[in-house]
From Swiss-Prot:
Positions carrying Phosphoserine: S428
Protein name per UniProt: Circadian clock oscillator protein KaiC
GO molecular function per UniProt: ATP binding; ATP hydrolysis activity; DNA binding; magnesium ion binding; protein serine kinase activity; protein serine/threonine kinase activity; protein serine/threonine/tyrosine kinase activity
Source organism: Picosynechococcus sp. (strain ATCC 27264 / PCC 7002 / PR-6) (Agmenellum quadruplicatum)
Residues annotated as binding ATP 1: G46, T47, G48, K49, T50, L51, S86, K221, L222, R223, T225, H227, T237
Gene symbol of the encoding locus: kaiC
Similarity comment text for this entry: Belongs to the KaiC family.
Chain positions with Phosphothreonine modification: T429
Length: 516
């Protein structure tokens, strides 16, 4: 039996990783990309492959002082520098300082004809020369597909890519090599062989879900080391690629026993003294049941106590929100003038869910609020899959809890009267407190009802109470004690005789349980 060979230099080390400092990538890769190895980044057109390759080099040079080499087969060095400048990355200064070298291997615009045996010997030698001359530690190659687009023989492609990868490994550089694929969920790469000669494979996707594009990243393999499995959404911002590693989030947030007021005294009593600080509250109900009013009272109460608050509105404009709040005696404009309130209004269709999530996180990070509200979640759910929407809600709630912020969200149900589910997207388990608002028909008149459907970690009132809206705002009255089946949407009045009979039966049961 063969025994493992020993080295005089000490024990064999495992795969070392180099941090990329790309937001979220180090989390899903469990520490970064494997050092001294090549990572294949594959994706269709417009997925962000070139951007990832440039950002990887730029961060390595700026944060770790690793010299870098960028090999381009498609764009000119001028275009690459100009495009990177849009993200605030000054590649030209790095080139002038000798920290970055851009090797132009783009094809002749007049075209080339392949004659004889095809190989990359000359190109590999050019890359090796540049690596040694500039002492490069990081290399990005964009993209190998352009090299082989005139030569479709898979065995030749596999052989030449293997030679290139082997030479890069011999030179001990950490490299990214981009390649194109034809379908989002088809073969990993165009020629079907690239992934087999690479130690690491990352797939970028840009999928049309409903009416919106959704970018995701998946680490298919990192040979010899661990990584997170599955697809993770990402967006492209002014700072580059931003990945949301929702699966990397841990349920380690602190929980506070402190209570905060909802702004409605009776609702505070129904919740055992108010909402828990850093909890997530969901108000769900049909349109017009008073969800936005509860949100407005919640924000007003925070500002009255000198706390900062943000309202992310996706159904009403700033002017409309201010006008409606004013009719309830709430002055949003005065709160904004004092710097306590921020109203951010936009259409849900103006951006993808990942872009909305990034905007929410950025605004929270900048404004530092104690309370946030989203009105409404159901507007954001339009035109996206349930899984994508649930990931968005997890991202928002997780970040709010991490920052110890109390969140109040609304959800509009399709059911006008009665209720079959709390939300259509099954996000109720993510929230801590659920307020159910609905219409009920009592004696030929339409009334509103409210009840605390759920509240984690606290006693709460189980009654279904009447909820009225007037110029003074919200008022919660007594329970509908003489009615049953209100939640089902078919309230039935309990007759006095029936109540007496029930009382008689209960007294009889109690008498039987008394000792003789």
């Amino acid at each position: 039996m063969n025994q493992p060979t020993s080295s005089n230099n000490g024990a064999i080390k495992g795969v070392q990783k180099i941090r990329t400092l790309i937001e979220g990538l180090d989390e899903i890769s469990h520490g970064g990309l494997p050092s001294g190895r090549t990572t294949l980044v594959s994706g269709t057109s417009g997925t962000g492959k070139t951007l990832l390759a440039i950002q990887f080099l730029y961060h390595g040079i700026k944060h770790f002082d690793y010299p870098g080499l960028f090999v381009t087969f498609e764009e000119s060095p001028r275009d690459i520098i100009q495009n990177a400048h849009s993200f605030g990355w000054d590649l030209q200064s790095l080139v002038d300082e000798g920290k970055l070298f851009i090797l132009d291997a783009s094809p002749d615009p007049d075209g080339q004809e392949v004659v004889g045996n095809f190989d990359l010997s000359a190109l590999i030698e050019r890359i090796q020369y540049a690596i040694r001359k500039y002492n490069a530690k990081l290399v990005s190659i964009d993209s190998v597909t352009a090299v082989f687009q005139q030569y479709d023989a898979a065995p030749v492609v596999r052989r030449e890519i293997f030679r290139l990868v082997a030479r890069l490994k011999h030179l001990a550089v950490t490299s990214i090599m981009t390649t194109e694929r034809l379908d989002e969920y088809g073969p990993v790469a165009r020629f079907g062989v690239e992934e087999f000669v690479s130690d690491n494979v990352v797939i970028l996707r840009n999928v049309l879900e409903g009416e919106r594009r959704r970018r995701t990243i998946e680490i298919l393999k990192l040979r010899g080391t661990t990584h997170m499995k599955g697809e993770y959404p990402f967006t492209i911002t002014n700072d580059g690629i931003n990945i949301f590693p929702l699966g990397a989030m841990r349920l380690t947030q602190r929980s506070s026993n402190a209570r905060i007021s909802s702004g409605v005294e009776t609702l505070d009593k129904m919740c055992g003294g108010g909402f828990f600080k850093d909890s997530i509250i969901l108000a769900t109900g049909a349109t017009g049941t008073g969800k936005t009013l509860l949100v407005s009272k919640f924000l007003e109460e925070g500002c009255r106590r000198g706390e900062r608050a943000i309202l992310f509105a996706y159904e009403e404009s700033r002017a409309q929100l201010s006008r409606n709040a004013s009719s309830w005696g709430i002055d949003f404009e005065e709160m904004e003038r004092k710097g306590l309130l921020k109203l951010l209004c936009s259409y849900p269709e103006s951006a993808g869910l990942e872009d909305h999530l990034q905007m929410i996180k950025s605004e929270i990070s900048e404004f530092k609020p104690s309370r946030i509200a989203i009105d409404s979640l159901s507007a954001l759910a339009r035109g996206v899959t349930n899984n994508a929407f649930r990931q968005f809600v997890i991202g928002v709630t997780g970040y709010a809890k991490q920052e110890e912020i109390t969140g109040f969200f609304t959800n509009t149900t399709d059911q006008f009267m009665g209720a079959h589910s709390i939300t259509e997207s099954h996000i109720s388990t993510i929230t801590d407190t659920i307020l159910m608002l609905q219409y009920v028909e009592i004696r030929g008149e339409m009334s509103r009802a409210i009840n605390v459907f759920k509240m984690r970690g606290s006693w709460h009132d189980k009654g279904i109470r009447e909820y009225t809206i007037s110029e003074g705002g919200a008022a919660i009255k007594d329970s509908f004690r003489n009615y049953e089946r209100i939640i089902s949407g078919s309230p039935t009045r309990i007759a006095v005789d029936e109540k007496s009979e029930l009382s008689r039966i209960m007294r009889g049961v109690q008498d039987k349980t008394l000792p003789e």
